[in-house]
Amino acid sequence: MRPWRCVSMAKAPAAPSSTQPDPVSYEAALEELEQLVGRIESGQLPLDQMLAGYQRGAVLLNFCRARLEAVQDQIKVLDEGALQPWVQE
């Protein structure tokens, strides 16, 4: 008997690089993240691209969270250290 070995029949398209730069804004990161989630959820990505997309998504999510925390901290400073409850007018 011959031992099994994995042979790739076709090369998958290049996966997004995990060294992509941070987005320029929260809005750009959110838009890229939404598009990425759509591609992943479609089920049409090869496994390698799905993994790379997941990794990029984690980077984008961390970027968005950091920006939101920074804005929240700035609001606390403007509100004298206490985050005020939102009251819709």
Curated annotation (Swiss-Prot):
Molecular-function annotations in GO: exodeoxyribonuclease VII activity
Top enzyme category: hydrolase
Known catalytic reactions: Exonucleolytic cleavage in either 5'- to 3'- or 3'- to 5'-direction to yield nucleoside 5'-phosphates
Protein name: Exodeoxyribonuclease 7 small subunit
The organism of origin for this protein: Acidovorax sp. (strain JS42)
Stretches assigned to coiled coil: none
Described purpose of this protein according to its UniProt entry: Bidirectionally degrades single-stranded DNA into large acid-insoluble oligonucleotides, which are then degraded further into small acid-soluble oligonucleotides.
Family: Belongs to the XseB family.
Primary gene name: xseB
Keywords: Cytoplasm, Exonuclease, Hydrolase, Nuclease
PANTHER family: EXODEOXYRIBONUCLEASE 7 SMALL SUBUNIT (PTHR34137:SF1)
Main subcellular location of this protein, as a coarse class: cytoplasm
UniProt GO BP: DNA catabolic process
Keyword Transferase on entry: no
